[in-house]
Amino acid sequence: MWDVIDLSRWQFALTALYHFLFVPLTLGLIFLLAIMETIYVVTGKTIYRDMTRFWGKLFGINFALGVATGLTMEFQFGTNWSFYSNYVGDIFGAPLAMEALMAFFLESTFVGLFFFGWQRLNKYQHLLVTWLVAFGSNLSALWILNANGWMQYPTGAHFDIDTLRMEMTSFSELVFNPVSQVKFVHTVMAGYVTGAMFIMAISAWYLLRGRERNVALRSFAIGSVFGTLAIIGTLQLGDSSAYEVAQVQPVKLAAMEGEWQTEPAPAPFHVVAWPEQDQERNAFALKIPALLGILATHSLDKPVPGLKNLMAETYPRLQRGRMAWLLMQEISQGNREPHVLQAFRGLEGDLGYGMLLSRYAPDMNHVTAAQYQAAMRGAIPQVAPVFWSFRIMVGCGSLLLLVMLIALVQTLRGKIDQHRWVLKMALWSLPLPWIAIEAGWFMTEFGRQPWAIQDILPTYSAHSALTTGQLAFSLIMIVGLYTLFLIAEVYLMQKYARLGPSAMQSEQPTQQQG
């Protein structure tokens, strides 16, 4: 039976998964629209303006529904995760506020000018508007991923003994968090791949049916060039992201790789394995020697810690965390004797582990060896979902690289419409970016468990005092509403894609010159 924590996690996870069906396409499409319109302004060829307007209509559908699905996410921090909001709100809220004030308003203002400014702006002004929408979309992703990156690697903050919550000490450390920076570029690049694949798939559909040949060939060419560069960048930055994870989240990396034991350097990479959580081992594993050590440490002599070793390392932190937790209870009840405060300051870095232990030890004054053992096992995520979601992401990314390279070669040869198998391959590859992105998001968030904020706040302690009935009702409502949004997206996209660019010829604007 699911409890409040499970239902809260499911609600946020499903909300984010639905929302992230729309976000990557927004990031990718708007950048491609800016490129198409730039070609129009530079060359004066109106076909590129027509392409911008046609793909822009599909972008508008996706943008509107993406905004709608994102609204409830920020509210859930207050409704479902109130302790989280109180405990780290001063830090976590800063990048979200910057996103709203700087990025979202910029994006929202200029997206209206993009759609309704064709007859009111000259082509140079409209091009500037399009690039500003693209800049705003990417800036929005930057601030949101700064917030998420801080959850993975909390820098520039400390526990304030007066307010009994986390406070920011350095805004620059939050902004330039190395995990955030790598996550931002990796995620945005994945969005570019999504936009490119979307345009290529629909263009391939037109070419297979002998429709909209001029627009489809040019769109496919732009998509294949842009998409190839983007998928190469995505895979390269994925390697950088994994390296950062190895440095700051070794438990997540070990779960991603099904690494139970610390093996001699350089560690092998498990291509496939069957992790068994209860036995703390893999039932079987197919390995590539040395590859994991090279990827995770960029060396041949550094070991990759295994989950058993990492669990053992949590024991002293749980002990110190227990003492910090007990001292915090004294301080919160008014005991601020200098020796108490001094003792707490020496232990506050492990307070999160005390919160984690409290889930397994109702009486923190008397913690048994079995309770410590349960907390140690609870300090790692379920390995199989993390292990397989990582491989789904990498597998889809590798297939996308192959598709993009084949499409690019045939495009450069000028024979793309002569090879129907390439067009069919592009069409049937349309779901791959979304599968990769959703699997990657799941791996990133689920692999951080049991932490809401890595090593600082367990998910167990972050929730609100709601009932299961309240959460079940709101979960059903959100899933139902978001499913309707998704159906609307698919219907409208299919409708206007089937109509094609030629259906818009009668409504072409006369753009101001100058």
Curated annotation (Swiss-Prot):
Tell me what induces its expression: Induced when bacterial cultures reach stationary phase; synthesis is triggered by phosphate starvation or a shift from aerobic to anaerobic conditions.
Stretches assigned to the Periplasmic side: 43-94, 150-187, 240-392, 491-514
Q: What happens when the gene is disrupted?
A: 3-fold decreased ubiquinone levels but no change in redox levels of the ubiquinone pool (in aerobically grown minimal medium with glucose).
Its EC number is 7.1.1.3
Give the Cytoplasmic membrane side ranges: 1-22, 115-129, 208-219, 413-470
- InterPro entries, alphabetized: Cyt-d_ubiquinol_oxidase_su_1
Question: Which keywords describe this protein according to UniProt?
Answer: Cell inner membrane, Cell membrane, Electron transport, Heme, Iron, Membrane, Metal-binding, Translocase, Transmembrane, Transmembrane helix, Transport
Purpose: A terminal oxidase that catalyzes quinol-dependent, Na(+)-independent oxygen uptake. Prefers menadiol over other quinols although ubiquinol was not tested. Generates a proton motive force using protons and electrons from opposite sides of the membrane to generate H(2)O, transferring 1 proton/electron.
Its recorded name reads Cytochrome bd-II ubiquinol oxidase subunit 1
Q: Which organism is it from?
A: Escherichia coli (strain K12)
